[in-house]
UniProtKB/Swiss-Prot annotation:
The modification N6-carboxylysine is found at K220. InterPro entries: Amidohydro-rel, Metal-dep_hydrolase_composite, Metal_Hydrolase, Urease_alpha_N_dom, Urease_alpha_subunit, Urease_AS, Urease_asu, Urease_asu_c. The keyword Cytoplasm applies. It catalyses: urea + 2 H2O + H(+) = hydrogencarbonate + 2 NH4(+). Carboxylation allows a single lysine to coordinate two nickel ions. Pathway: Nitrogen metabolism; urea degradation; CO(2) and NH(3) from urea (urease route): step 1/1. Substrate binds at H222. Its cofactor is Ni cation. GO terms for biological process: urea catabolic process. The lineage of its organism: Bacteria, Bacillati, Actinomycetota, Actinomycetes, Micrococcales. The keyword Secreted does not apply. Its EC number is 3.5.1.5. GO terms for cellular component: cytoplasm. This is Urease subunit alpha.
Length: 585
């Protein structure tokens, strides 16, 4: 015999289900649950008088060796490039073990995940679960960035630097074996996955190759070191040999050539372009056109995202500080002015919304904010919905990111747009850096870097941040209170952020060459070590929901951007969601 229950009551008890919609924070973005892998009437819930008790929802006989998970997140709504759906999520040995229906198969049919005596429970009812964010544009200037990033939902930081040296304040470079090794040793202290870029500036192969063998997972070419065609070619030659990435900040002043010369130097090889719009640096005024190429993996940094009435004014001062410029030197001021163009900045939001720009990142403390990658990504999505309307792919059947037919919810939902935007800071940067087999999505077998959100605070303040299956940061109240919730509730480090747990729940990414050379053993690294791989065969077509390659042009006099001949622009925002009302206290 079956029973019916009102949807509102069901959502209060077990969380929303198929067809229900959830508003994300205070935006106009609405998520619709596409499917529910739990079983109606057999939902598992923890608590007094609830289901997960010995002999009921928990199997009292199975040992951990019988595939019992370490943790189950119950009834969570998963928001991922792979789908938007509800499920129980099992974690084991620091990885996502299974996604499906949890419970006790001795009394319940359809159980994929057996809850046992070894299992901890995290209540995912009425919560949204995403993969941890991946920021591929980190200037390692201050160690405090790590906690700031973690508390925003970012669990992987890739970039370069040595601390507050002038080279690091301007460029994401950890130059040479000695600095690379010291930074790898420093990374042992942090509950964060970390990978380093070496300096991609040499006129011979060996000065670059030795940095890859020392542990760098890529090379950074930056105009402040000279973004010459020779440096570009040499870096890509080494990258092809060692299967690592090259990230590039091109030549704003066009001293070493124009954008066409850079394109010729790249010569069809895959490359990860930073702040591709150009305000963060790059050929003035038309570096943005490179985003339409099939071998280019284009990213934005967050200071220009989204375009607001304050964007232009704040950028000039930021640029002068970050790139060691002197406001008393006219040429330095002209250099700064050439990078800040309202027309190309206005086009950037639209190119993100069209899936032409594929990745968002921070440019931490070097014209970007390390704790705002996720927030600003969703602010762009909201701004674009308000200015451009609902995407054609939303509200019915359309082609998915892989070219196959897939449903993206009913009218009134934004599922396609949500998949496009969540991919920008999860799976796509993972693909670009060769770590997508380890992190970047909520899929079985992936490392359990996960973020749990209250929908009202989605994209702004996480509820829990899990690193390698253990809670590393959480929204926590007064430690002297009688319960966990009294004010002040702030994001605080949890047990996963301390002691030797850090080494078992966080990853240092290295090149295969460094691993083969015994760098982890030489340096005494205790963190989990994973290689980067599969980079040199990438194309933009591999990026999820953000693989468009149109013809992009920039008028050299007006800076107006066109995509396939159509003008592309948007108005600056006066008001944004996910902003001051969330940070009053």
């Amino acid at each position: 015999m079956s029973f019916e229950i009102p949807r509102r009551q069901y959502a209060d008890l077990y969380g929303p289900t198929t067809g229900d919609k959830i508003r994300l924070a205070d935006t106009e973005l609405f998520l619709e649950i596409e499917k529910d892998l739990t079983v109606y009437g057999e939902e598992v819930v923890f608590g007094g008088g609830k289901v997960i008790r010995d002999g009921m929802g928990q199997n009292g006989q199975a040992t951990r060796d019988e595939d019992i998970p370490d943790t189950v997140i119950t009834n969570a709504v998963i928001l991922d490039h792979s789908g938007i759906y509800k499920a129980d999520v099992a974690l084991r040995d620091g990885h996502i073990f299974r996604i499906g229906k949890a419970g006790n198969p001795q009394i319940t049919d359809g159980v994929d995940i057996v809850i046992g005596a070894s299992t901890e429970i995290i209540a995912g009812e009425r919560k949204i679960l995403t993969a941890g964010g991946i920021d591929t544009h980190i200037h390692f200037i201050s160690p405090d960035q790590v906690a700031t990033a973690l508390t925003s939902g970012v669990t992987t930081m890739i970039g370069g630097g040595t601390g507050p040296a002038e080279g690091t304040k301007a460029t994401t470079v950890t130059p040479g074996k000695w600095h690379i090794h010291r930074m790898l040793q420093a990374a042992e202290a942090f509950p964060m996955n970390i990978g380093l870029f070496g300096k991609g500036h040499a006129s011979a192969v060996e000065p670059l190759a030795e940095q890859i063998r020392a542990g760098a997972i890529g090379l950074k070419v930056h105009e402040d070191w000279g973004s010459t065609t020779s440096s570009i070619d040499m870096s890509l030659t080494v990258a092809d040999e060692y299967d690592v990435q090259v990230a590039i900040h091109t030549d704003t002043l066009n001293e070493c050539g124009f954008v066409e010369d850079t394109i010729r130097a790249i010569n069809g090889r895959v490359i990860h372009t930073f702040h591709t719009e150009g305000a963060g640096g790059g050929h003035a005024p038309d570096i943005i056109k490179i985003a339409g190429m099939p071998n280019v993996l284009p990213a934005s940094t967050n200071p220009t995202l989204p375009y607001t009435r304050n964007t232009i004014e704040e950028h000039l001062d930021m640029l002068m500080v970050c790139h060691h410029l002197n406001p008393d030197i006219p040429e330095d001021v002209a250099f700064a002015d050439s990078r800040i163009r309202a027309e190309t900045i206005a086009a950037e939001d639209v190119l993100q919304d069209m899936g032409i720009f594929s990745i968002t990142s921070s440019d931490s403390q070097a014209m970007g904010r390390v704790g705002e990658v996720i927030t600003r990504t969703w602010q762009v999505a909201d701004k674009m919905k308000k200015q451009r309307g609902i995407l054609a792919a939303d509200g019915g059947m359309d082609l998915g990111a892989d070219g196959s037919a897939s449903a993206h919810g009913s009218a009134g939902s934004d599922n396609f747009r949500l998949k496009r935007y969540v991919a920008k800071y999860t799976i796509n940067p993972a693909l670009a850096q060769g770590i997508a087999d380890t992190v970047g999505s909520v899929e079985e077998g992936k490392f359990a870097d996960l973020v749990l959100w209250d929908p009202a605070f989605f994209g702004v303040k996480p509820e829990l941040v899990l690193k390698g299956g253990q809670i590393a940061y959480a929204l926590m109240g007064d430690a002297n209170a009688s319960i966990p919730t009294p004010q002040p509730r702030t994001m605080r480090p949890m047990f996963g952020a301390f002691g030797k747990a850090v080494q078992q729940t966080s990853i240092t990414f290295l090149s295969k060459a460094a691993i083969d050379a015994g760098v982890p053993e030489e340096l005494g690294l205790e963190k989990l070590i994973r290689p980067v791989s599969g980079i040199r065969n990438l194309t933009k077509a591999d990026l999820k929901y953000n693989d468009a390659t149109p013809d992009i042009q920039v008028d050299p006099e007006t800076y107006q951007v066109t995509v396939d001949g159509e003008d592309v622009t948007c108005e600056p925002a006066d008001v944004l969601p996910m902003a001051q009302r969330y940070f009053l206290f």
